[in-house]
Amino acid sequence: MRNTICRLPNGQSYTVTPVFGGVNFKSNDMHLKDSIIPPGWTIVLYTNQNTDQPAQDSVPPEEERGRSRYTQGEAEEKTRTTRFTTPTLNDDCFYISFIVNPPSTDFKPPVSPTRQIAMMIWVSLYWYFHEPEPDLHLQTDAASQTPLTGKPKGEWRIHLKREGIFKGRNLLQKLERMGLIASEESSVGLEPSETQESGAWSRMFVSRRSFWQIDPRIFVFTLVPANPLHSAPSSPFISPRFASPSRESPIPTESPASPTGKDFPLHMPNEGPFASSSHLPTYFPPPPTQYTFTNGLRHPVRPKPPHQGEVFYIRFIPSVGQYLSFRVPILSSSATPSRGHGHSHSTSSIEVPPQTTPSDLDLLHKWMNDPRVSAAWGEGGPKEKQEKFLRNNLTSRHSFPVIGCWDGKPFGYFEIYWVKEDRLGALIGGADNYDRGIHLLVGEQEYRGSHRVAIWLSALVHYCWLADPRTQTVMLEPRVDNEK
């Protein structure tokens, strides 16, 4: 087991401890009285092993079957279970066996037990799919003589067993409707009504591929302060030039400000994409497709992108031990003032940027005048040129600008766009309605390198998948003279 701390994108974290037969999750944020996720739970996690001869003790005594991992037909399938040590391609199984339910005075009782269980499953899988990847190659008779690089690859899956908490009536059906679990048996079945012994829901699974395409806002969210002004930043727009999350303060927040005069906005940004004041998920599915025309080209009406300063993607990266986040830049040319320390209802102590933090326009001016960047982008020159550049991108109807941050420190500038309306769409022809593209530059030398590129590039693509499930392709368009 590689990871003993599970850091969620909403800022909460759990200590993961091996216990007999499985793994225990314990919250590190016990001071959160209104937390939706319970402070702890235990999952039974084990690995099935195929064997030609089933072990003599593979079938436990009748009186112990309630505690064992024995299921009907296990002996016939000639499988035995072993202790989980490292993930396998598709032989791991789990179920929730125990939930810590503290007094309602300490934690808010669940309004929907099913959704609470779904949250625990999501957190458990979030930890599991951060464990070392198993060998994906399939060992088949047809490919027995094939070199390893040519062998077919399978899907990394973990199976959910109908044991423990999952024996609840209609629970698996609800989880399947949420899109969290799946089954390849998509028939109605011959049983007129389902029973506890029914096998129709006994072979549910979650694949890594599907898990990372589920928007985490469906299952993980945090509560905002009762007074929204406590989250307003001391910026000209009362829109956060977010101090993107660090390891100590993963959720960005701001200090009080006085919303007076013409600067008071209609939009009050929240504390990141996971904040909720209604005790409900912050995710909504994409709207129905409507069409419009741009320069004679018919394309879907696009949803509005995130607001200036809004953090729209957060994730802890174990391999570098840092939080990666993406936010929309702010046009204001004034440096971000010091905001001291603050607190939110979703995390503990909040660390904010120092007085010397440059504005986004200052960063863009610095990066665009780097000879390496200027040669590719051609946007070097006085600050007025970068201001016009940023203004044009903030008013674009088919793209929006992005600032990437490592532990709160900006490192690069990006643009996420819809290919069909972009000039690239006209050049390649046949672009799909929901194809997206990315422009990119890394401005800080300390964050260059192939390892970090692979991380933030896959994260940008990940966001594109989450933003609209209809997106099937994400494109890059390097210059013809780009040697890399």
Swiss-Prot record:
A Pfam family the protein falls into: Acetyltransf_8
Protein keywords: Acyltransferase, Cytoplasm, Transferase
One Gene Ontology term from the biological process aspect of the record: siderophore biosynthetic process
Record localization: Cytoplasm, Cytosol
Induction: Expression is not affected by iron availability and is not regulated by the iron regulator sreA.
Statement: the UniProt record of this protein carries the keyword Transferase: yes
Binding positions for substrate per the UniProt entry: H439
Catalytic EC class: transferase
Main location: cytoplasm
Keyword Cytoplasm: yes
Result of knocking out the encoding gene: Decreases ferricrocin (FC) biosynthesis during iron starvation and completely blocks FC biosynthesis during iron-replete growth. Blocks conidial accumulation of FC-derived hydroxyferricrocin (HFC) under iron-replete conditions, which delays germination and decreases the size of conidia and their resistance to oxidative stress.
GO-annotated molecular function: N-acyltransferase activity
GO cellular component: cytosol
Active site annotation, chain numbering: E477
Record-listed E.C. numbers: 2.3.1.-
Pathway the protein contributes to: Siderophore biosynthesis
Top-level taxonomic group: Eukaryota
Residue ranges, annotated region (Disordered): 51-81, 240-264, 335-355
Family: Belongs to the lysine N-acyltransferase mbtK family.
Protein function: Acyltransferase; part of the siderophore biosynthetic pathway. Aspergillus fumigatus produces 4 types of siderophores, low-molecular-mass iron chelators, including excreted fusarinine C (FsC) and triacetylfusarinine C (TAFC) for iron uptake and intacellular ferricrocin (FC) for hyphal and hydroxyferricrocin (HFC) for conidial iron distribution and storage. TAFC consists of 3 N(2)-acetyl-N(5)-anhydromevalonyl-N(5)-hydroxyornithine residues cyclically linked by ester bonds; FC is a cyclic hexapeptide with the structure Gly-Ser-Gly-(N(5)-acetyl-N(5)-hydroxyornithine)x3.
Name by which UniProt lists this protein: Acyltransferase sidL
Organism: Aspergillus fumigatus (strain ATCC MYA-4609 / CBS 101355 / FGSC A1100 / Af293) (Neosartorya fumigata)
Annotated gene: sidL
